[in-house]
Amino acid sequence: MSLLREAEKCLANQKTYASLNAFITPLQRAGPWRDRVRDSDTRRERGVTKSPLDGKLVAIKDNICTRDMPTTCASRILDTYTSPFNATVVESLEKSGAIIAGKTNLDEFGMGSHSMHSHFGPVKNVTESRREPISPGGSSGGSAVAVATGQCYAALGTDTGGSVRLPAAYTGTVGFKPSYGHVSRWGVVAYANSLDTVGVLGSSISTIREVYKTINHPDLHDPTNLPPATRTRLTAAVHNSSTTRSSPSPYLRIGIPTEYNIHELSPTVRTAWQRSIVHLQRMGHTILPVSLPATKHALAAYYVLAPAEASSNLARYDGVRYGTRDTDAPDDAEPGGYLYASSRGKGLGSEVKRRILLGAFSLSADAIDNYFLQAQRVRRLVQADFERVFRVKNPLLPAVDVDADVDGRDKKQIAGDNAGVDVLVVPTAPTLPPTVESLKRASTVETYMNDIFTVPASLAGLPALSVPVQMRGLSTVGDGDESKGDGADAAFGSVGIQAIGQFGDDEMVLHVGEMLEGMHG
C-alpha cells in the first residue's frame, strides 16, 4: 500500500471515530501534507527515504507546541492560542519526513488520569463490545485512542506520573516513557518540570523504536536535556554492565517488587502479571523477588510535588502574558485584581484549580516543611530504592548509603534481598479500565489511585514501558465491584504490564517489552 493510501486510511478513521473525541485539531483533508506524502512515496520507490517515519502520520498531544496548529492544552484559557514555533520533538519528526496527523485531546494541562477534564469534552475509549463506556486513561488519552483506532501511525504524549503508560494499558496500545532528560521538553507546555517527559504511543514496540530514535537527541534549548558527554557516560555504563551480565549467561535477572502485590490488585491483573512472569521464566530468565519499601509513599509524594510545580508554572496564564482575557469587569472592581482573578477563574477548569490550590498550600510558609520538603525526601528514598535494586548503577548518582534505616528495616538486609536485577516487571494499573459512570461517582482521591504503579518510575526518572499482554481466555468474572473497573473486559482482550529499567537503560526496557509483546495467554 502506498504511503498516501495509508494516510488517507488514517484520515478516514479520524472521521469514523470522531465521536471518540481523540482529536482537538484533526488533520484537514486538503492541504500541503498530501504533496509531502507523495514526495515520501517517491523517495520510498527510489530507496532513499529520510527515515522509517517518512510519510507516516504521527499525532501530537495538544500540550506540545506546533506552529501550524493551535496549542490549547485542552483549556479554555488557551483555546485561541497558536505557538509561533514548533517544539523540538515536532521539528525532529518533520525532519524525518513524518506528517503531523493533528493535535490530540487530553486532560487540561495534563492534569488527570482519565482524559475527562478537557474544555473540548472527554475522550472516549472504544466500546464496541461494552455496554458502558470505559476510561481511556489519561492524560494522554487522545493520543492512545488515536493509535488504538488507526487514526494515526503513532502519537506523542507527555508522561508526568503515568500519563502515557496508563492510557496505553487501558486502550491495548504500547506506551513508552523514556529516561528523564533523553527527549527534549523545549516547546512542551510545563506541568511539573522535574517530572514531565515526552513519551511515545504506538501499536507495536517496533513503532515505538522508530519514533524514539527520531526524538532522542541532545537539545541546547532545553536545560534539562542530557548533553552529549553525559549520554556517553550513560552508554558506557550500560555497555560495561551488559558485557558483565551477558557472561556467563545471556539470560536476564528480572525483579518482581513485593510492594506491588497489593490487596486492591484486580484478580485479572494479578493473573496477567503471574502469566507474564511464568512466560519470562520459561524463556530462561531468572525471576527474583525484590523490595522497594518507599513505594508505598510514592503516590502521596507525587501529589504534593507535581501540584507544587504546577502552581508556579501555571501562574503565567493570567490573561495578560498568556491566555484568554476576561474584560467584563463590574464598575467598582479593582482593574488588575479583577482581571487576574476573573481570567483564571473562568479560563481554568476545576481539576486544574484544585491542583493549583493544593500546590500553593504545600509551598506556603506553614506547610512547606511538613509537606513539600517531606515529599522531596520521599522522592530521594524512592530513587535510592531503585538504585539498590538494579545491577547497573546510575553513574550520575552518588553511591547509595546502605547503613541507615527505611521504615524500620535495615538497608543492608534490603540490599541483600535485592541481589541486583536488570529490569522490573509489574502491572501498569491495579485494575482494568473503570467505567466512566463509576468515575463520576468516585472521590478525587480514588481517581488518583490509578497512578499508584506508574508514579514511582516517574519520581526516579526511570524508563518505563507499558505493553498490552494478550490474554486469551482470561475471564474477569468474579473480579469484584464493577464500579471500580474490575468487572470490565480488558480493552482489546489485553492487560497492561510494565517494564521498568535503570536510568539510561532504555534499550533494556524495550527489549523486555518485546519478550512480553509476543506472549499470548
Swiss-Prot record:
The active site is at K61, S139, S163. Keywords: ATP-binding, Ligase, Mitochondrion, Nucleotide-binding, Protein biosynthesis. One of its GO terms (cellular component) is glutamyl-tRNA(Gln) amidotransferase complex. The keyword Ligase applies. Pfam families: Amidase. It is found in: Mitochondrion. GO terms for molecular function: ATP binding; glutaminyl-tRNA synthase (glutamine-hydrolyzing) activity. It comes from the Eukaryota. GO terms for biological process: glutaminyl-tRNAGln biosynthesis via transamidation; mitochondrial translation. The keyword Nucleotide-binding applies. It catalyses: L-glutamyl-tRNA(Gln) + L-glutamine + ATP + H2O = L-glutaminyl-tRNA(Gln) + L-glutamate + ADP + phosphate + H(+). Its EC number is 6.3.5.7. Belongs to the amidase family. GatA subfamily. Allows the formation of correctly charged Gln-tRNA(Gln) through the transamidation of misacylated Glu-tRNA(Gln) in the mitochondria. The reaction takes place in the presence of glutamine and ATP through an activated gamma-phospho-Glu-tRNA(Gln). Subunit of the heterotrimeric GatCAB amidotransferase (AdT) complex, composed of A, B and C subunits. This is Glutamyl-tRNA(Gln) amidotransferase subunit A, mitochondrial.
